[in-house]
């Protein structure tokens, strides 16, 4: 089980992680919300690290990605969809991992969906850093063109990516 690293996942106050761990939590996360204040985030990660726990991060720049439906592309523009560049994922990953590395917490990047993020994680792992990653089945099976006809059930966070990102993840998932 996972538990919220900050109270009400608001990113303002650190949860009582040791009590949550005693209650059965094996990992901590802030869900789909990033912790914007780096001082609070680092303190929370230090606390999780002191418990030899895992932090699961949702990699995206929250403000860049808030309320969007698609990845920035010609397709999204043609459809008139609000969008975010796929680099928002890499921005979130790099920021979060920098703080995770400072705290020496075990870090899991949830739902990696782009080639650039995958390559960054591969680089960090080659340096012996404490990082793992995952993706979602949606991002392995579908791409941004699947939202045609405004299929709202494909409104995901992170949004569906290009076919080339999807194929890259499929070809390299074993890494």
Regions found by a protein language model. Name each.
Residues 12-175:
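Histidine/acidic residue-rich metal-binding segments in metalloenzymes
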Residues 1-12:
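Metal-cofactor-binding active-site regions of metalloenzymes
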């Amino acid at each position: 089980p996972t538990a919220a690293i900050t109270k009400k996942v608001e990113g303002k106050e650190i949860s009582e992680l040791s009590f949550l761990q005693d209650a059965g939590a094996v990992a901590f996360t802030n869900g789909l919300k990033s912790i914007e204040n780096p001082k609070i985030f680092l303190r929370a990660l230090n606390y999780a690290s002191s418990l030899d726990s895992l932090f699961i991060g949702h990699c995206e720049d929250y403000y860049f990605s808030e309320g969007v439906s698609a990845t920035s592309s010609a397709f999204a523009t043609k459809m008139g969809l609000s969008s975010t560049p796929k680099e928002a994922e890499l921005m979130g990953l790099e920021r979060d991992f920098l703080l995770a590395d400072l705290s020496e917490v075990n870090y899991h990047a949830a739902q990696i969906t782009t080639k650039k993020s995958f390559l960054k994680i591969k680089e960090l792992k080659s340096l012996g850093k404490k990082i793992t990653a995952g993706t979602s089945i949606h991002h392995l099976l579908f791409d941004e063109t699947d939202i045609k006809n405004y299929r709202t059930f494909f409104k995901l966070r992170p949004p569906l990516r290009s076919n080339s990102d999807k194929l890259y993840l499929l070809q390299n998932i074993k890494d």
